[in-house]
Amino acid sequence: MPENSGSAGGITEYGALVAARKACRVCVERSPGTIRSCGEFEFDPDVVSHWELWLGHKRPKLLAVGQDFGNIGYFVRNRGRDEPNNKTNDHLRKLLVEAGFDVNYPPELDRNAPVFLTNSILCVKEGAMNAAVRAGWVSACADKHLRPLVSYLKPPVVVGMGNCGWQAVRRVLAVEDAPKRISHAAGSSWIAADQTLVFAVGHPGPLGVINRPWPQQIADWRRIGEAVSVLAPREREMDTRSGRE
């Protein structure tokens, strides 16, 4: 498990989130033959999000939500981890740098960058890597897994990347005045009822860069960086959570 996990109580809370993800079969039972639980596999890492094996800070300044971790073939081939030279990750790292984050090259674990990455669904698809993600899966995973993750991390900034990531973020943060379609929402931001800053951006994958061109994505992430740069420090909260004096 990545560091920055906090006190014993925090570790227990995080462990409960991991156990819930591994045990969940809601969408598998609703859509047999189209989606698989990663918890079926003995090599499934003890994480909430498989993306956090790159960026998984437990007191992040920013939580970013993408689409999925690929398909069952990708998951099994890489034993629950990302492969090097993943275009989505390479693009995302460049965008995070534009936002002012100094992050390791993926998939090397970065224990210091205050970023947590997750996806709109935590299971993996059967079929092709570009197979559709069903709206029902996103809604179910948002309610059962993303909502408690947000409650645990308490990120001051949350970013929905692409259509699925945006639908999940919009649902959990209840920014119902925001456009539902990512094509209308991308590039804009809102303040949730709990004062979380919510941003909608294009997905950093190859198709996402076609849908929202690279210069626009860079501009979007620079705006996110400006918002992050004026956040109040989280040191006091981090010290309290970790039990340090």
Locations of regions flagged by a protein language model:
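Short, amphipathic alpha-helical "lid/cap" segments that border enzyme active or binding sites
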Residues: 143, 215-229
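Intrinsic disorder/low-complexity segments enriched in polar/small residues
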Residues: 4, 30, 236-238
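Class I S-adenosyl-L-methionine
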Residues: 2-10, 243-245
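A polyanion-binding, active-site-adjacent surface
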Residues: 6-178, 196-209, 214-215
